[in-house]
Regions:
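Short, charged/polar connector segments at secondary-structure boundaries
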Residues: 1-95
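Bateman (tandem CBS) regulatory domains
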Residues: 9-13, 111, 210-211
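Amphipathic, charge-rich alpha-helical segments that serve as recognition/docking helices
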Residues: 17-20, 27, 64-173
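Structural motif corresponding to the C-terminal cap of alpha-helices
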Residues: 37, 42, 138-141, 175
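Glutamine-centric residue-chemistry signal
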Residues: 38-40, 115, 203-204
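Amphipathic alpha-helical extensions and coiled-coil-like segments
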Residues: 132-136, 161-280
């Protein structure tokens, strides 16, 4: 079907991948399309309750590039005072799919992105996409077991099996606060893989202290030093074999040392803030 791109909406379920594409990426794709044409049709489904309107299922990068081409053509007409004509990119051939469940639509989006984008460079996006894909394959109409869903993920993704297993473990088994600090890039993936070796209670206790460190002034040397010291201590707790009593003793001491250092850093921050305030009067 030939559809006007103004009648096609972006899919909110694709928001996870949207940040991976820069304006420069879209501009390069637009140049390719202008030169070689649209090699792959957009895939859309009818928008319920809105006759003639569609929602995108596959091809968001292409849709954004087409919009850019239309904009460029319009600008050229205005600058050169040419007759106002519809851009050749305003209407494009689309594949229209019908009768998919909401879950099937999301699985379609994730499957396409996990295949086409290869090894997604953004750790958070890759991890969240992999987890969503596996979770949705366990729902109707697929109803796969967790093991079957994970196998299906490994078949569509070019990432190696260990990377996928670790990503799913971080998304499903890591303390939510630690995972949020990873998403915010305060912690890194290797560190969080280590924290999976801690018990859930230990993870929660460590997370509470890491949150306090993250709240310190990002520009301060102390923030980085305290974080590095606690990271090293947590690695030691996670990896070294000790009796339960000795492990708890080492773990508690590491948290206390970090708490003390945080207190000192806050005192320094407050003093610096007071000096700045005095200078401003």
């Amino acid at each position: 079907s030939e559809i006007n791109i103004n009648d096609i909406e972006e899919n909110p379920d694709n928001a996870l991948y949207r940040e991976l594409d820069t304006e420069e990426d879209i501009a390069l794709l637009a140049d390719d399309i202008r030169r070689a044409g649209l090699l792959h049709n957009l895939v859309v489904f009818p928008k319920t309750g809105f006759g003639g309107k569609y929602v995108l299922l596959s091809g968001e990068r292409r849709l954004r590039a087409l919009r850019l081409l239309v904009e460029q053509d319009k600008r050229e007409q205005e600058e050169k005072q040419l007759p106002n004509r519809m851009s050749e990119w305003q209407k494009v051939q689309c594949k229209v799919v019908r009768n998919l469940t909401e879950n099937e639509k999301v699985v379609y989006i994730d499957s396409a992105n996990l295949q086409v984008r290869g090894g997604i460079s953004n750790e958070r996006v890759m991890r969240q996409a992999a987890a969503r894909f596996v979770e949705n394959l366990q729902k109707a109409p697929y109803n796969l077991s967790a093991a079957e869903a994970k196998k299906a993920l490994k078949e569509v993704s070019p990432l190696n099996s260990r990377t996928i297993d670790k990503a799913l473990s971080i998304q499903n088994d890591l303390n939510p606060d630690l995972r949020r600090l990873l998403d915010e890039e305060f912690l890194n993936r290797a560190e969080c893989e280590t924290y999976l070796r801690l018990t859930l209670k230990e993870q929660a206790r460590a997370a509470a202290v890491f949150l306090k460190i993250a709240a310190l002034d990002p520009r301060s040397h102390e923030r980085r030093a305290i974080k590095d010291a606690l990271t090293t201590a947590m690695l030691d707790v996670a990896v070294e074999r000790r009796s339960m009593q000795e492990r708890e003793s080492v773990f508690a001491a590491a948290l206390q040392n970090a708490q003390d250092a945080i207190g000192q850093a806050k005192t320094q921050e407050n003093k610096a803030a007071a000096v700045d305030k005095d200078h401003n009067f």
